[in-house]
């Protein structure tokens, strides 16, 4: 009965009307009052009016650029890196060249890999960035993110997942491709799913996962008045362990175009028996690069119809139904480029094609990934944001 109710046109109209009402409220400046209503933890106080240069303190990193690999048996890196500076400046102009970014990051290895030289990192984090036709945004992100992560003393790698062709953009499916390909390379502790146009403003926002559940990291974007737009928002930048990602069957593959997938993902977290955690609002600051609407990423007219079916579709639509054709894998000086044909919207003239990953069921794929996980390392586990992942929300 409930299912029939959700599929009625009047119900969809109500959902559309509700979203329009919320958007109107937020556009009139309601973000801060909404944040207060939901009691978001503001966290420690930072002075964002006097940010430091994003390349500050890199001269204090141990080890010479391009030096030999770090010896075995090093002590763990401190939970809170002494190199952190807090708020960092974010500039969108001029856009740096790739050569300039390479020159300023001599410790970054091919494929966008980095590992601290003087201590054992507490987390191995893969940054996965869906991408198409945003070259300026990508260069800004790489210029900003590499020094940001090095100061946190993490082992990390950056993966840029490029959607081939001119079909409708599918952010969530590209993230599934990125997770699949990143886990072929290494047993990452943490998967950071990162929009290309968001730059972090505070290096106390640690790029590590919360073992208790998925983290939504971009809690305070300038686009939304540096407040969380609504409690279940999960867009922009999020972090999950591989086990958490597989437990919710990854992200949906059927959201072609803009909108809807973030709410679907938040629902998956709940249906998989997990809760979203967040850093304090004062820590999770991000600036969005200004841009016009993307051709091929128009508003998804089917998003509400898909959302009302999430409760029944999430176990069938995700990593266990992922299809794509890997066209290229290139180790660039700043990132690993993955180019994939993910097909087109099945409501269009051609359905997705390519090899199926995995060849078996979702249980078989999950078992494969779990078997690839290494035994627990001795010593303290990776630590989440030192300002405390304050409770679940």
Swiss-Prot record:
Per the entry, what this protein does is: Responsible for the synthesis of complex-type N-linked oligosaccharides in many glycoproteins as well as the carbohydrate moieties of glycolipids.
Q: What's the family?
A: Belongs to the glycosyltransferase 7 family.
Keywords of this protein's UniProt record, alphabetized? Disulfide bond, Glycoprotein, Glycosyltransferase, Golgi apparatus, Lipid metabolism, Manganese, Membrane, Metal-binding, Signal-anchor, Transferase, Transmembrane, Transmembrane helix
Annotated localization:
Golgi apparatus, Golgi stack membrane
Q: Which residues bind UDP-alpha-D-galactose?
A: 130-134, 169-171, 196-197, 226, 258, 291-293
The record lists N-acetyl-D-glucosamine as bound by: 260-263, 303
Q: Where does Mn(2+) bind?
A: 197, 291
The molecule here is called: Beta-1,4-galactosyltransferase 3
Q: Which organism's genome codes for this protein? A: Pongo abelii (Sumatran orangutan)
Q: Which Pfam families match?
A: Glyco_transf_7C (PF02709), Glyco_transf_7N (PF13733)
Q: Which residues lie on this side of the membrane: Cytoplasmic?
A: 1-10
Q: Which reaction does it catalyse?
A: an N-acetyl-beta-D-glucosaminyl derivative + UDP-alpha-D-galactose = a beta-D-galactosyl-(1->4)-N-acetyl-beta-D-glucosaminyl derivative + UDP + H(+); N-acetyl-D-glucosamine + UDP-alpha-D-galactose = beta-D-galactosyl-(1->4)-N-acetyl-D-glucosamine + UDP + H(+); a beta-D-GlcNAc-(1->3)-beta-D-Gal-(1->4)-beta-D-Glc-(1<->1)-Cer(d18:1(4E)) + UDP-alpha-D-galactose = a neolactoside nLc4Cer(d18:1(4E)) + UDP + H(+); a beta-D-glucosylceramide + UDP-alpha-D-galactose = a beta-D-galactosyl-(1->4)-beta-D-glucosyl-(1<->1)-ceramide + UDP + H(+)
Record-linked InterPro entries: Galactosyl_T (IPR003859), Galactosyl_T_C (IPR027791), Galactosyl_T_N (IPR027995), Nucleotide-diphossugar_trans (IPR029044)
Pathway participation? Protein modification; protein glycosylation
Could you tell me which cysteines form disulfide bridges?
77-119, 190-209
Q: What is its EC number?
A: 2.4.1.-, 2.4.1.38, 2.4.1.90, 2.4.1.275
Q: Where are the transmembrane segments?
A: 11-31
| GO terms assigned for molecular function | beta-N-acetylglucosaminylglycopeptide beta-1,4-galactosyltransferase activity; metal ion binding; N-acetyllactosamine synthase activity
- This protein's record includes keyword Transferase: yes
**Membrane topology of the entry:** Single-pass type II membrane protein
Q: Which gene encodes it?
A: B4GALT3
């Amino acid at each position: 009965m409930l299912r029939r109710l959700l599929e009625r046109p009047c119900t969809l109209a109500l959902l559309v009307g509700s979203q329009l009402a919320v958007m109107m409220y937020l556009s009139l400046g309601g973000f801060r009052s909404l944040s207060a209503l939901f009691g978001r933890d503001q966290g420690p106080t930072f002075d964002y009016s006097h940010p430091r240069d994003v390349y500050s303190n890199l001269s204090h990193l141990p080890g010479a650029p391009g030096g030999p690999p770090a010896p075995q048996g090093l002590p763990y890196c401190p939970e809170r890196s002494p190199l952190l500076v807090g708020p960092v400046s974010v500039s969108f102009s001029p856009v740096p060249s790739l050569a300039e970014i390479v020159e300023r990051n001599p410790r970054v290895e091919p494929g966008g890999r980095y590992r601290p030289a003087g201590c054992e990192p507490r987390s191995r984090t893969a940054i996965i960035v869906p991408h198409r036709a945003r070259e300026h945004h990508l260069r800004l992100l790489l210029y900003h993110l590499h020094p940001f992560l090095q100061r946190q003393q993490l082992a990390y790698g950056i993966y840029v997942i490029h959607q081939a062709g001119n079909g409708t953009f599918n952010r969530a499916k590209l993230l599934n491709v990125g997770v699949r390909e990143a886990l072929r390379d290494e047993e990452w502790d943490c998967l950071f799913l990162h929009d290309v146009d968001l730059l972090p403003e505070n290096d106390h926002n640690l790029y590590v996962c919360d073992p208790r559940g998925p983290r939504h990291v971009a809690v305070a974007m300038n686009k939304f008045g540096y407040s969380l737009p609504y409690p279940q928002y999960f867009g922009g930048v999020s972090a999950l362990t591989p086990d958490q990602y597989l437990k919710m069957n990854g992200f949906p593959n059927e959201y072609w175009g803009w909108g809807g997938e973030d709410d679907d993902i938040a629902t998956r977290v709940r249906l998989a028996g997990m809760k979203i955690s967040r850093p304090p609002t004062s820590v999770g600051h991000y600036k969005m690069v200004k841009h016009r609407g993307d051709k091929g990423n128009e508003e998804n007219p089917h998003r509400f119809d898909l959302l009302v079916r999430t409760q029944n579709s999430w176990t069938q639509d995700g990593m266990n139904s992922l299809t794509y054709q890997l066209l290229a894998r290139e180790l660039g000086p700043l990132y690993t480029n993955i180019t994939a044909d993910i097909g087109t919207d099945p409501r269009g003239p051609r359905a997705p094609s390519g090899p199926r990953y995995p060849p078996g069921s979702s249980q078989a794929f999950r078992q494969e990934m779990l078997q690839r996980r290494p035994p627990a390392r001795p010593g303290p586990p990776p630590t989440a944001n030192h300002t405390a992942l304050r409770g679940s929300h």
